[in-house]
């Protein structure tokens, strides 16, 4: 524990103690509501020690002068139109956005200082969420078991404050953070939405997302330290009987450690084939070991969260599965390791025989049912997947309607381009194309057939990606290269987030 605590304090030696005055900076709130600004400008301004109480007074005055009559019909607690409650919530929300920008500053400064003096070429490929799948294709084929883990979140809000206290020793800011956390007691639903990850999920609030990522960073930083020293304890007298199948393969990883407390010698086996992947609130831990070792890792995680962070994780949130007969629901894909059989005829002299080769393949499948459900929720189709018109878009121009449908279709094609089976993706594109045609025909009070006959192929080209347009111009329709492109798997390394497509209005 002394080593872990020393490592945590070493990383936080750069920390800044006074960020509370930044709340009085007007550019903080401008940046919070205009994400197109350059973050470097914010960091440069953060260094300048200029603050004005008059700026905040003006901001509060403008917030109170805004129209507060736009309220949610479904929220009965917000129906006090002439009361003070809605104004208070609006004020808290705006200050929360500014506070989120402030607490992000020290971490941005840490990133800049760590890159100084290092020749590191910035690459979007390293940030792409699609870069995870080539890694899975390369590693998971040689592994046996996987832990499917839902990362727990703290039941008590004070744990979040204590986590940030290691990084930001500003009592005023921490008290303000407590106020925001208790103001939004339903933060669990903001951080971890109940619906599965999809391109149609709503964006989370900035402050709560930051706090959640900080908490996960604390989990992972300590986990990496323990992983470097991690091993599986073996008793000396029973060392020869443990994992006899893999004994000779792991003999070189055998080390001898003397434990001072008990005065005995323990044997440790390091696990060389252990891979960890995380996206949002879900992580995967895959290993080449046996199921017994994975059970040890499972209860190790439970004890790790409970002892170090006072976070209780139920065992049913961690599943142990064998990769050969399990499908992973990860990042909007259904992934599994399948076995493909190929028969090869071999001939030696006058004798010929058939050889059956079994090849492992990592498949990624488009989850058609959740996607159709998301389209139905966004009013592009009904619950059975039959396209319907988007009535709320009929007031737009024809070009805007086609552009919106086409952009959603292209983004989906872009994200699910690495799918092993494109039939489900073709169905989604069909729903969007026909929904667009029904929307336009409803606007012009015409039939879908007459509308498609009038526009022709120009209407369909709006739903193609740029790669499909270029290849369709260069290659003929019956070309094997073009058909191979539609069937092949392509991972785009420029995707850094899943966009909110349903509410793109």
Curated annotation (Swiss-Prot):
Record-linked Pfam families: Intron_maturas2, MatK_N
UniProt keyword terms in alphabetical order: Chloroplast, mRNA processing, Plastid, RNA-binding, tRNA processing
Gene Ontology molecular-function annotations: RNA binding
Keyword Manganese: no
Gene Ontology CC: chloroplast
Disulfide bonds: none
Function comment: Usually encoded in the trnK tRNA gene intron. Probably assists in splicing its own and other chloroplast group II introns.
Similarity remark: Belongs to the intron maturase 2 family. MatK subfamily.
Protein name according to UniProt: Maturase K
Taxon lineage: Eukaryota, Viridiplantae, Streptophyta, Embryophyta, Tracheophyta
């Amino acid at each position: 524990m002394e080593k872990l605590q020393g490592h945590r304090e070493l990383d936080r030696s750069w920390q800044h103690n006074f960020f509370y005055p930044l709340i009085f900076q007007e550019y903080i709130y401008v940046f919070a509501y205009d994400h197109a600004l350059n973050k470097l400008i914010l960091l440069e301004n953060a260094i300048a020690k200029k603050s004005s109480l008059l700026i905040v007074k003006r901001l509060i005055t403008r917030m109170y002068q805004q129209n507060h009559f736009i309220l949610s019909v479904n929220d009965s607690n917000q129906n006090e139109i002439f009361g003070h409650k809605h104004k208070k919530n609006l004020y808290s929300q705006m200050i929360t956005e500014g506070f989120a920008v402030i607490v992000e500053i020290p971490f941005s400064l840490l990133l800049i200082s760590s890159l100084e003096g290092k020749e590191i070429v910035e690459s979007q490929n390293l940030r792409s969420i699609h870069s995870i799948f080539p890694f899975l294709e390369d590693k998971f084929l040689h592994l046996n078991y996987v832990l499917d883990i839902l990362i727990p979140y703290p039941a008590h809000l004070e744990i979040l404050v204590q986590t940030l206290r290691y990084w930001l020793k500003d009592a005023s800011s921490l008290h303000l953070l407590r106020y925001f956390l208790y103001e939004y007691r339903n933060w669990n639903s903001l951080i971890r939405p109940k619906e599965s990850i999809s391109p149609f999920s709503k964006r989370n609030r900035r402050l709560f997302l930051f706090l959640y990522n900080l908490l996960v960073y604390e989990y992972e930083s300590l986990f990496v330290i323990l992983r470097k020293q991690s091993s599986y304890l073996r008793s000396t007298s029973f060392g020869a009987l443990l994992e006899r199948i893999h004994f000779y393969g792991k003999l070189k990883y055998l080390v001898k450690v003397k434990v001072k407390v008990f005065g005995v010698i323990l044997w440790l086996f390091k696990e060389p084939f252990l891979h960890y992947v995380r996206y949002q609130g879900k992580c995967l831990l895959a290993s080449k070991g046996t199921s017994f070792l994975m059970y040890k890792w499972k209860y190790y995680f439970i004890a790790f969260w409970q002892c170090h962070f006072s976070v209780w994780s139920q065992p049913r949130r961690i599943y142990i599965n064998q990769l050969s007969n399990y499908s992973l629901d990860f990042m909007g894909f259904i992934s599994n390791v399948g076995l493909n059989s190929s028969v090869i005829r071999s001939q030696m002299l006058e004798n010929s025989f058939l050889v059956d080769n079994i090849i492992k393949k990592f498949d990624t499948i488009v989850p058609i049912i959740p996607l159709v459900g998301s389209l139905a929720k966004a009013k592009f189709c009904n619950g059975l997947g039959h396209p319907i018109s988007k009535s709320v878009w009929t007031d737009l121009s024809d070009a805007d309607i086609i552009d919106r449908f086409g952009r959603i279709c292209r983004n989906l094609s872009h994200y699910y381009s690495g799918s092993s089976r494109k039939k489900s993706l073709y169905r989604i594109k069909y729903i969007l194309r026909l929904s667009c045609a029904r929307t336009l025909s409803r606007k012009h009070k015409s039939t879908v057939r007459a509308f498609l006959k009038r526009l022709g192929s120009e209407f369909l080209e709006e739903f193609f990606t740029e790669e499909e347009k270029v290849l369709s111009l260069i290659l003929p329709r019956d070309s094997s290269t073009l058909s191979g492109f539609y069937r092949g798997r392509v991972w785009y390394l420029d995707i850094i987030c899943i966009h909110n497509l349903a509410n793109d209005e």
